[in-house]
């Protein structure tokens, strides 16, 4: 799918059908006036630089998707169902300071982190990752963040923790989409504990060397590059370590369409989108989709012996 949608493209072709049907109510909500809000992190000016970043050997050397596309074309249904809605509605609405993330559950050291605490948790790195949307388009994004494993090490999961659940902000005053029953808010995602501890799994606080824009999930979001983009929860406010597999938002919305693992797999199509190929934003010729989004060498061992058609 190209960054510019054809004028005759129906909403139901790019969003799940229940969301397309509820769109009118959401757009009505977006007409409400926005409260002024800051975008930057503490001690960092709005859209400010994140300073010197440590390069990462885990980065891709592929051509980057332009910043304008990364920040202007994305899914963030809390602000609207069109790709351009987050850029239109999130800046100036989403208050990202003060911000806290509560970490709780099956851990020895439960804690509520301020965004300043999180910024000091580990050296920030630039991670250039491929991002693959289940809708059949992709980008290459230079994220800034630190491994989720660093936070996990701080809170010390106990022997009962098997999964990690991520809960995002759901504030109808800031996020007009939350007023509409398009999804079961707040947005919830989850990972197996070993997936969360994998070196590739990132908590991102920026992109392109700058503070994370509101429309991209500020001030802190998850990035799991071998999974479809919807697994990477935005604007996280709570992280829970749990015994049972979390039931994610998209699993509730379409259990036959969205599985818990949601690993990029060209051999398993979504009911409405082929996963065999993808359109890299900014390119005109489709390219073949790689298993695990090209990260098979690093992560395939996590799923050894699993039927990836069944556990999609």
Swiss-Prot record:
<feature type="binding site">
    <location>
        <position position="221"/>
    </location>
    <ligand>
        <name>Mo-molybdopterin</name>
    </ligand>
</feature>
<dbReference type="InterPro" id="IPR019546">
    <property type="entry name" value="TAT_signal_bac_arc"/>
</dbReference>
<dbReference type="InterPro" id="IPR000572">
    <property type="entry name" value="OxRdtase_Mopterin-bd_dom"/>
</dbReference>
<dbReference type="GO" id="GO:0043546">
    <property type="term" value="F:molybdopterin cofactor binding"/>
</dbReference>
<comment type="similarity">
    <text>Belongs to the MsrP family.</text>
</comment>
<feature type="binding site">
    <location>
        <begin position="77"/>
        <end position="78"/>
    </location>
    <ligand>
        <name>Mo-molybdopterin</name>
    </ligand>
</feature>
<dbReference type="GO" id="GO:0046872">
    <property type="term" value="F:metal ion binding"/>
</dbReference>
<dbReference type="InterPro" id="IPR022867">
    <property type="entry name" value="MsrP"/>
</dbReference>
<dbReference type="GO" id="GO:0016672">
    <property type="term" value="F:oxidoreductase activity, acting on a sulfur group of donors, quinone or similar compound as acceptor"/>
</dbReference>
<dbReference type="GO" id="GO:0042597">
    <property type="term" value="C:periplasmic space"/>
</dbReference>
<dbReference type="GO" id="GO:0030091">
    <property type="term" value="P:protein repair"/>
</dbReference>
<feature type="signal peptide" description="Tat-type signal">
    <location>
        <begin position="1"/>
        <end position="47"/>
    </location>
</feature>
<feature type="binding site">
    <location>
        <position position="168"/>
    </location>
    <ligand>
        <name>Mo-molybdopterin</name>
    </ligand>
</feature>
<keyword id="KW-0500">Molybdenum</keyword>
<dbReference type="Pfam" id="PF00174">
    <property type="entry name" value="Oxidored_molyb"/>
</dbReference>
<comment type="function">
    <text>Part of the MsrPQ system that repairs oxidized periplasmic proteins containing methionine sulfoxide residues (Met-O), using respiratory chain electrons. Thus protects these proteins from oxidative-stress damage caused by reactive species of oxygen and chlorine generated by the host defense mechanisms. MsrPQ is essential for the maintenance of envelope integrity under bleach stress, rescuing a wide series of structurally unrelated periplasmic proteins from methionine oxidation.</text>
</comment>
<dbReference type="InterPro" id="IPR006311">
    <property type="entry name" value="TAT_signal"/>
</dbReference>
<keyword id="KW-0479">Metal-binding</keyword>
<dbReference type="InterPro" id="IPR036374">
    <property type="entry name" value="OxRdtase_Mopterin-bd_sf"/>
</dbReference>
<feature type="binding site">
    <location>
        <position position="133"/>
    </location>
    <ligand>
        <name>Mo-molybdopterin</name>
    </ligand>
</feature>
<protein>
    <recommendedName>
        <fullName>Protein-methionine-sulfoxide reductase catalytic subunit MsrP</fullName>
        <ecNumber>1.8.5.-</ecNumber>
    </recommendedName>
</protein>
<feature type="binding site">
    <location>
        <position position="74"/>
    </location>
    <ligand>
        <name>Mo-molybdopterin</name>
    </ligand>
</feature>
<keyword id="KW-0560">Oxidoreductase</keyword>
<keyword id="KW-0574">Periplasm</keyword>
<feature type="binding site">
    <location>
        <begin position="232"/>
        <end position="234"/>
    </location>
    <ligand>
        <name>Mo-molybdopterin</name>
    </ligand>
</feature>
<keyword id="KW-0732">Signal</keyword>
<feature type="binding site">
    <location>
        <position position="216"/>
    </location>
    <ligand>
        <name>Mo-molybdopterin</name>
    </ligand>
</feature>
<comment type="subunit">
    <text>Heterodimer of a catalytic subunit (MsrP) and a heme-binding subunit (MsrQ).</text>
</comment>
């Amino acid at each position: 799918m190209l960054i510019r949608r054809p004028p005759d493209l129906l909403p139901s072709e790019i969003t799940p059908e229940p969301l397309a049907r509820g769109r009118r109510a959401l757009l009505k909500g977006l007409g409400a006036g926005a409260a002024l809000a800051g975008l930057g992190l503490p001690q960092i000016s709005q859209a400010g630089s994140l300073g010197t970043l440590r390069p990462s050997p885990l980065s891709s050397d592929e051509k980057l998707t332009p910043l304008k596309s990364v920040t202007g074309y994305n899914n963030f249904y809390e602000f609207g169902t069109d790709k351009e809605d987050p850029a239109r509605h999130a800046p100036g609405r989403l208050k990202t300071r003060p911000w806290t993330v509560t970490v709780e559950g099956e851990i020895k050291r439960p804690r509520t982190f301020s965004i300043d605490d999180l910024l000091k948790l580990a050296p920030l790195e630039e991670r250039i990752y491929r991002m693959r949307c289940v809708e059949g388009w992709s980008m290459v994004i230079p994220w800034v963040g630190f491994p989720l494993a660093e936070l996990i090490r701080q809170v010390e999961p106990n022997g009962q923790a098997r999964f990690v659940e991520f809960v995002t902000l759901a504030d109808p005053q800031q996020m007009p989409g939350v007023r509409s029953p398009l999804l079961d808010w707040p947005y919830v995602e989850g990972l197996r504990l070993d997936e969360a501890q994998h070196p590739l799994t990132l908590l991102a606080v920026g992109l392109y060397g700058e503070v994370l824009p509101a429309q991209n999930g500020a001030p802190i979001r998850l990035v799991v590059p071998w999974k479809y983009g919807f697994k990477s929860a935005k604007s996280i406010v709570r992280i829970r370590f749990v015994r049972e597999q979390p039931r994610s938002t998209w699993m509730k919305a379409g259990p036959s369409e969205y599985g818990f693992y949601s690993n990029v797999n060209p051999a398993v199509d979504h009911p409405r989108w082929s996963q065999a190929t993808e359109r890299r934003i900014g390119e005109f010729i489709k390219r073949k989709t790689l298993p695990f989004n090209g990260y098979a060498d690093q992560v395939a061992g996590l799923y050894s012996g699993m039927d990836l058609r069944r556990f999609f």
